[in-house]
């Protein structure tokens, strides 16, 4: 009896199973998606980097006039980038709200489906466990009945032998 265990020893479902949102979008995909949504921001960052590199080169050369020009260009490029960020944020705000609502609804339906699968799995496990316990109880009752039957048989045989020896 020590070796008998529940018939289904598979692990129970986990709350981390099938978390598609966690695995859907990697970093590169997210960068490309953001680049497609707002292509002027990387352009502004590139202009800023170009202006900083130009300013550092002109500083090494000692050309103060070009250094000041590149620093002004850097300022304009950064202003352009910030303006594009603000305008892009205003433009994409409605889309982001819709996307969040959609993702929230999708997550809710997936959560409900996962919960339903979890409950079905638990119900199946419970039924299996009840059936296993019932079989085990029948087996132990059968062994007890069998043991009782042997005891009764020994008692009957003893009574017969007493009756035979006493001559009844």
Swiss-Prot record:
Keywords: Coiled coil, Membrane, Mitochondrion, Transmembrane, Transmembrane helix. The gene is RCF1. Belongs to the RCF1 family. Cytochrome c oxidase subunit which plays a role in assembly of respiratory supercomplexes. Signal peptide: none annotated. The chain crosses the membrane at residues 40-56, 75-92. Associates with the respiratory chain complex III/complex IV supercomplex. Its main location: mitochondrion. GO terms for cellular component: mitochondrial membrane; mitochondrion. It holds the Pfam family HIG_1_N. It is found in: Mitochondrion membrane. It is a multi-pass membrane protein. Residues 12-103 form the HIG1 domain. This is Respiratory supercomplex factor 1, mitochondrial. GO terms for biological process: mitochondrial respirasome assembly.
């Amino acid at each position: 009896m020590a070796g008998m265990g529940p018939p289904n020893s598979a692990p129970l479902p986990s709350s981390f199973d099938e978390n598609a949102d966690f695995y859907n979008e990697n970093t590169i995909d997210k960068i490309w998606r953001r680049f497609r949504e707002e292509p002027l921001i990387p352009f502004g960052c590139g202009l800023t980097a170009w202006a900083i590199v130009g300013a550092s080169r002109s500083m090494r050369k000692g050309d103060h006039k070009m250094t000041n020009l590149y620093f002004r260009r850097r300022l304009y490029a950064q202003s352009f980038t910030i303006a594009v960020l603000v305008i892009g944020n205003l433009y994409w705000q409605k889309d982001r709200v819709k996307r969040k609502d959609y993702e929230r609804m999708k997550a809710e339906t997936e959560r409900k489906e996962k919960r339903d699968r979890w409950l079905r799995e638990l119900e199946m496990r419970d039924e299996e466990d009840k059936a296993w316990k019932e079989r085990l109880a029948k087996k132990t009752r059968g062994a007890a009945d069998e043991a009782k039957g042997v005891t009764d048989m020994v008692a009957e045989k003893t009574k017969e032998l007493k009756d035979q020896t006493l001559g009844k």
